[in-house]
Amino acid sequence: MPPSLRFGVVHDFRSPPGSEIGLPEVYAQAMEQISLVDQLGLDLVWFTEHHFLDDGHLPNFVPVAGAVAARTSHVRISTDICLLPFAHPVRLAEDLAVLDNLSGGRMELGIGMGYASHEFAGFGLPRSRRVSLVEEGIQILRLAWSGERFSFKGKRWDFDDLLVTPRPVQPGGPPLWVAGMTAASAERAARFDTHLLPQGARDEVLDPWRARVAELGRNPDDYRVGIIRSCFVTDDPDRDWLPIRTAERYRASVYARFFSETPDKLSSFERGREAIPQGWIVGDVDHCVSELTSFIREYGITDVVTWGAAPGLPPSAMNASLERFAKEVVPRVRAGLSAGV
């Protein structure tokens, strides 16, 4: 049976220099919003990770996930993404196991290998090690969550006769996702039997992943495909969208800087090819329903999250839109897709 459609929010907890709101208030309002998201019956809360930025971008999702687990009862908690090369895999396995118990089995983990050179330099790691660190890390996480003693000897990590406790609530541990911008990362997600967080061009990531999953004897429709595709519901876009659009230009500029310091070609992002859409959908309920339904159907998306805050603006500024999204947009999207409309 294909996975159910899920919707939610994603947060990065940042306050750019000169913002009207400081980081303590960003965290406080985001937590209040996440409680609202849980009460509204949305399905997901995701977090991003980056390091050494003057806007305070969330560097570690673990404490925040613990706070969310303690104040919610429904939403599933995950990352888009956890930068696995910068984490000790055994410690991360322990953290996720504790979080899975704390949340009653609501944890998932989206994994990426990173690309920004300044982050690898900051952790004293050669960027050339990122593939092996991710691939060994995935193997170690799964061994650690097996509930059995394990040993591992690899290129980067070497452990002997370890038992990781507590056991996660979910058998085998929190579900894993792999993020991908290239055909190589799509192949990695298929090979390690994970869900997919695609970015970049469809024919570089999404289509090769589906083909490789099928080659391995599995059905790609049994897996989840998740993406950040934000939706701002308003009856007056000219009035309400302007401050958020201005703030979002800051986020785009930060990622452009990351790509500019990257020594290799990542994907369509820097070659000007058309990527899987991740821009905002802005408009009234009918417009948002139509655009989101078409997007989900065209790309086979199962999980959609919208930004819970624009950089430098209070998370509370998004709450009215989120309420309409949950109450007026999501039910119609679900109904339309299930009916084949």
Q: What residue spans do the PLM features occupy?
A:
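Active-site mouth loops of central-metabolism enzymes
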Residues: 13-27, 82-90, 171-180, 276-285
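Internal, glycine-rich beta/alpha segment that forms the wall or movable "lid"
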Residues: 2-5, 85-192, 202-207, 211-222
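N-terminal beta1-alpha1-beta2 module of alpha/beta enzyme domains
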Residues: 1-76, 172-174
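Hydrophobic faces of well-ordered beta-strands that scaffold small-molecule active sites
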Residues: 7-11, 45-47, 77-79, 107-111, ...
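An alpha-helical appendage that flanks or caps ligand/catalytic pockets
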Residues: 3, 11, 39, 129-164, ...
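Short, acidic/polar
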Residues: 24-36, 95, 180-187, 287-294
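Glycine-enriched alpha-helix->loop->beta-strand junction motifs that scaffold or abut catalytic
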Residues: 72-74, 103, 188-197, 300
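Conserved, mostly hydrophobic/aromatic
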Residues: 41, 49, 68, 99, ...
